[in-house]
Amino acid sequence: MARIELDEVLRPREMFVLPGGKGVNAARAAVALGGRAITTGIAGGHAGRWIVEALSAEGLEPHWSFARAESRTAYVTVDESGSSVLVYERATPATPDEFAAFLRLLEERLLPACARAVVAGSIPAGLPPSDHGAIVEAARRAGVPLLVDATGPGLLAALEAGPDIVKIGRIEAVESGVVSEDATAVDAAVGLVERGARLAVATDGAQEVAAADASTVWRMSVPPIEALNPVGSGDSFNAALSLALMDGADVPTALARGVAAGSANALTKSAASLDPEVAAALEDDVTDTTIER
């Protein structure tokens, strides 16, 4: 819309209604970048049925488990200046039995069909944070490298299970208690490795992306762009990073592709609907610095 103003009726010029969530956005970006993606999660009620139908129509191969509670809705409003308002309903509940059914679906049917996996977002309300760790352990048993994008107690539970990759924002690392408030992106990445991640990536908005493993730190620049809508940029990063590693790229190359994909997404109006040619061009503007720990 032209301008976001409080206490006024807001009439958008364009609207996009589509299934969302961090995992779905990552799948959408993976397909945009030429990959194939299966989507899964716990869907509920009329909204959940619509999510599955819309994902199928979009070619995002839905294989979902179902719960009684209605799936939540999120609203994102962006104006011409790039300012945005995000209204996210709280996570809807699922029962332990409903999560157990989802985990069986994941272990028995989906992970065996995957080369890599991404688990992103929050566990449904009413479930213990340890269920994030259960997903990490399921992926390890299946031999599938897993990227975790989570915060708070769920992130800490995933770290205890020793995930292959963790990717979060620097501020999220601070809020989750991984590092102190004055920590840099490098500090956050190193802190995540010390907590259990084999490879950790910490983003810091448009400033910097840092990554670390047990022996090396990488610092990546972010291309200067005029962003239209940053929603889905982190998810696009996750998709590009995972695809690059699946194709055998080394870590700095995979990180550069992730940074470029996230930047390309920010140039679009709809989440995770990036142009792969724009992403490829932006990759040339990403520089990296490698530091031995």
Residue map of PLM features:
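Short beta-strand scaffold segments in enzyme catalytic cores
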Residues: 28, 73-77, 208-212
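A glycine-rich helix N-cap at a beta->alpha junction
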Residues: 56-69
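Conserved phosphate-binding/catalytic loop of the ribokinase/pfkB sugar-kinase fold
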Residues: 76-113
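Charged helix-capping and loop-helix junction motifs
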Residues: 100-104, 128-136, 181-187, 219-225
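Glycine-rich phosphate/adenosyl-contacting loop at the front of the ribokinase-like
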Residues: 1-40, 49-50, 221, 227, ...
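Conserved beta-alpha-beta core of the PfkB/ribokinase-like small-molecule kinase fold
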Residues: 115-183
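Conserved phosphate-binding/catalytic region of the ribokinase-like
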Residues: 141, 156, 160, 183-293
